[in-house]
Amino acid sequence: MRYRGASGDVLALQDISLSVRKGEFAAVVGPSGCGKSTLMRLVTGLHRPTAGTVSIEGKEVTGPVKIAGMAFQHANLLPWRKVIDNLLLPLEIVQPHRSQFRTKKKEFRARAEALLETVGLKGFGDRYPWELSGGMQQRVSLCRSLIHEPELLMLDEPFAALDAFTREELWCVLRDLWQKLRFTVILVTHDLREAVFLADNIYVMSARPGRIVQVKPVDFPRPRSLEVTYDKAFADIVHELRAKIAQVRIS
């Protein structure tokens, strides 16, 4: 996968092969600039591969994937819209929900309120984003990415800008949402503890041009509590991943 940068063509990904089963929670880690975010844009159809194919449920991806939801490092909520209206925005602009929005608005609003309750924000629908903390805004962002009931959730470092305590709190929020709704997740993160706590499998990428150089299964029983992060076995996996990433950074 190449793209045009300021100084010419950049080879971001090369000979990359990644297979994620339906319902899996996958995490992608690797050194900065290895192509993790490029991989995410390929999977969601925002970029077309210059070689090879991307397929979801056996169908080649040729454009933006409607069954996918996305959340990023910054919540990017519209400050002039109330929380409930920020949640409903994807349903207002994406088909087939757009054509149904007027007739199903009551149903869609109930869905949004149910999501807010699930993430501990019951009663906050009529607030504006600037009235919420950073952690609360990220909860709203997660809800917005799930409002159209996607089968695939793509997360690009969604908790990176938060403090450690809020970050761990939102790990548990995401864990509970995934266990309740059972969508497929691909999480791009630099936080190795986050990856080990949340994922079924961790895909380690090389330095650019990015390739998958290791797939690390995580076998801790579910549901996982934060107590598992203090186990020696947990720390051992984190150290193994850190050593692998250090190795590929200089290779």
For every predicted segment, state its role.
Residues 56, 204-205:
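Short hydrophobic beta-strand elements within the C-terminal catalytic ATPase subdomain
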Residues 161-164, 238-251:
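Extended, non-globular alpha-helical segments
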Residues 197-204:
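Conserved catalytic segment of ABC-fold P-loop ATPases
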Residues 1-182, 186-191, 198:
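ABC family nucleotide-binding domain
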Residues 3, 123, 150, 206, ...:
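A general structural signal marking secondary-structure boundaries and capping sites
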Residues 207-240:
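Conserved beta-strand-loop-alpha-helix hinge in the C-terminal portion
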